[in-house]
Amino acid sequence: MSPPAAIFEPTVAPTGIKGKVVVPETATIPGDSQTKLLDHFGGKWDNFKFAPIRESQVSRAMTRRYFQDLDRYAESDVVIVGAGSCGLSTAYVLAKARPDLKIAIIEASVSPGGGAWLGGQLFSAMVMRRPAELFLNELGVPYEEDPDMPNYVVVKHASLFTSTLLSKVLSFPNVKLFNATCVEDLVTRPGPNGNAQEVQIAGVVTNWTLVTLHHDDHSCMDPNTINAPVIISTTGHDGPFGAFSAKRLVSMTTIDKLGGMRGLDMNSAEDAIVKNTREVAKGLIIGGMELSEIDGFNRMGPTFGAMVLSGVKAAEEALRVFDDRKRECAE
């Protein structure tokens, strides 16, 4: 049985650039949009021609908007590090609950989504244990359920989930995704009496991913920064960019050492990750598999329910501490 598709009304904000935002009407009847396209274009290709353009117009259209976004989000309310299934779920819940917050998502890869474009071992299907199907219902993502196997549901392709979630997140006017961008460090404020274990996180240090990958063979580049009173780190378990914030907390002595992710145990891991998603240092919330490196939880393997519900918990934590952290960062 598949849930009905949710009706989603995309919202838009003024761009600050002369012009208007157009939100096309979507087809409500299967095949309707295809029929309209074929009616418009079909059999007319010999006379087809795009509207004329000058190359500089394309350059200006891109750069004006990108640098406007850099300027707007230099002071953000929340920065989410990592646009995998956990980070995107966090962004969705936060942006929907608090449309007044400016939310920046920083993703090192060109393609957001992390490992959630496929299930385990490059297979297509995505398995989520109940009650994570409630998040699928919220998004309107169809899934299969088996009366003989009532404890989990299956999305036919992980990419269906991720593309749906990503499209909804990017439709919010208060969200900006900066992909192909790395977080190289954390912006900090001293704790009372200089206590490193009470340091406050007050933003992120960013750079182009291609620059970050070549610091060992290039003399450039100094980074950029984004200030925010709440940082949510969902960079996954240890890897080239994984567990970044967790490892940085150790190197700046805010925590003594990492707990080290344990072996795979789905039953133990998923509950632990969701329940313990929290603010691990003032202004820094860690969720998803990155948390396993802090606390020494088991890995969960190819089941994704804890990723999305850890994102829900991270959003709840951010809403709980936001006002206090914003006031403290302003002092």
Curated annotation (Swiss-Prot):
| Entry's EC annotation | 2.4.2.60
* Highest taxon above the source species: Eukaryota
Is-annotated flag, keyword NAD? yes
What the protein does?
A: Involved in biosynthesis of the thiamine precursor thiazole. Catalyzes the conversion of NAD and glycine to adenosine diphosphate 5-(2-hydroxyethyl)-4-methylthiazole-2-carboxylic acid (ADT), an adenylated thiazole intermediate. The reaction includes an iron-dependent sulfide transfer from a conserved cysteine residue of the protein to a thiazole intermediate. The enzyme can only undergo a single turnover, which suggests it is a suicide enzyme. May have additional roles in adaptation to various stress conditions and in DNA damage tolerance.
Chain segments annotated as transmembrane:
none
Q: Name one GO cellular component term.
A: cytosol
* Protein name listed in UniProt: Thiamine thiazole synthase
Q: Which cofactor does it need?
A: Fe cation
Q: Which UniProt keywords apply?
A: Cytoplasm, Iron, Metal-binding, NAD, Nucleus, Thiamine biosynthesis, Transferase
Recorded family membership:
Belongs to the THI4 family.
Co-factor: note: Binds 1 Fe cation per subunit.
How does the annotation summarize its subunit structure? Homooctamer.
Q: Name one GO biological process term.
A: thiazole biosynthetic process
- Cite the binding residues for substrate: C86, E107, A108, G115, V183, D222, H237, M289, R299, M300, G301
Location, primary (coarse class): cytoplasm
Q: How is it modified after translation?
A: During the catalytic reaction, a sulfide is transferred from Cys-220 to a reaction intermediate, generating a dehydroalanine residue.
Q: What is any Pfam family matched here? A: Thi4
List where in the cell it is found.
Cytoplasm; Nucleus
Annotated GO MF terms: cysteine-dependent adenosine diphosphate thiazole synthase activity; ferrous iron binding; iron ion binding
| Modified residues annotated as 2,3-didehydroalanine (Cys) in this record | C220
Q: Which enzyme class, named as a word?
A: transferase
| Reactions catalysed according to its record | [ADP-thiazole synthase]-L-cysteine + glycine + NAD(+) = [ADP-thiazole synthase]-dehydroalanine + ADP-5-ethyl-4-methylthiazole-2-carboxylate + nicotinamide + 3 H2O + 2 H(+)
Which gene is annotated as encoding this protein in its UniProt record?
thiA
